[in-house]
Amino acid sequence: MPHLHIAEFKEVEIPSSKDGVSFNFIAKNSSHQEEKLISITVDEDEFFLLAIDENSKKLLKSDKLTRPPSIFNVHKALLSYASATCMNIISSNVPQNQKNIHLREVKALKDINYFATTFPKKEKICIEVGFGSGRHLLHQAQNNPNILYIGIEIHTPSIEQLLKQISIKNIENILVLNYDARLFMELVPSNKIDKIYVHFPVPWDKKPHRRVISTAFIEEARRILNIGGTLELRTDSENYYAYSYETFIAFEKTTLHINKNRDIAITSKYEDRWKRMQKNFYDVTMINSEESPELSLEGDFNFSHVKLNTQEVINLYKKTQKFDSGFINFERSYFLDDGAMLRVSMGNFDKPEHLYVIVKENKAYYYPKTPLRSKSNLMAHKLLNGVLCE
């Protein structure tokens, strides 16, 4: 995580700008005075910097929830803020002079809104969930230039490594997304995808609810796969294989191909290591045979007239509201100069979204972006609207 270790935190003039970075407003945590969020705009990216101003720790870093795809814009924002306030930097992991030309402007890296607004219309599309080193994804893309590959990963170093290779090799048929694949699949149009690769997912033996393969995931895979499309699981965990097989076979109608220790054209560096250790590998490939109805969701993320005053909004901190398939949890509350802001987790129990909601002048809106359009998020928004506005 990019950060600056500073001698003393100083507030920047609001609103102001420096070196192409705009400082929009500051949100102050209502329960932890040492924590502040600074709203930043760099190019088309809008996000928060997080300031921690404790006696033993004074840091300025990017806010995890709103961190943009471009790490360069985060670096630029941190250094510009420090320069604008003349802060003394004790130590830093932010490069001040060196710039990786392979990562500075990468068209392959996309935000979730890119897919939510207009999903790619390529004739053949494949998805890889958790691409790791990217070796398999790069191999597939280079050998199938007419197919669009969407690589989904939440590990930032893996993303940066893949983007560098895409730039060096000048590959134009890969799109990269830093997002939860389970949520992403909820916005994919029906019958659109040729293949879904899930290679060596984390087994999560102690937290099975976090596993990628689940009944809900398979249902979404069946919906978005075209007829003859496949979901391919590859794992070295016998427990995960057994669990996945039982989950697949529980469907009333399904076609599966099972392989053990199958050789494939390209392997990851971890797979090479595990082969030397003589570990077993299991493949479960589900073949879709049904056409699904078009995706249809009703509702929006607009708020009605807010009836709570600023202090009542602040007092929602730590409260939770539940509904049949999800919840809303008010994780943080913040004071603004002209209102309040909430950090909420909402949606499905197993795959919630974490968002900010600004409330001022009897109006409310999500910041810096609205939730992903999904059934559980629309239901959660309806409940949140009721809390704030009814």
From Swiss-Prot:
NCBIfam families recorded: PRK14121.1, tRNA (guanosine(46)-N7)-methyltransferase TrmB
Species of provenance: Sulfurimonas denitrificans (strain ATCC 33889 / DSM 1251)
Pfam families per record: Methyltransf_4
Residues reported to bind substrate: K206, D236
Name the record gives this protein: tRNA (guanine-N(7)-)-methyltransferase
Catalytic activity: guanosine(46) in tRNA + S-adenosyl-L-methionine = N(7)-methylguanosine(46) in tRNA + S-adenosyl-L-homocysteine
Coiled-coil residue spans: none
Function of the molecule: Catalyzes the formation of N(7)-methylguanine at position 46 (m7G46) in tRNA.
GO molecular function: tRNA (guanine(46)-N7)-methyltransferase activity
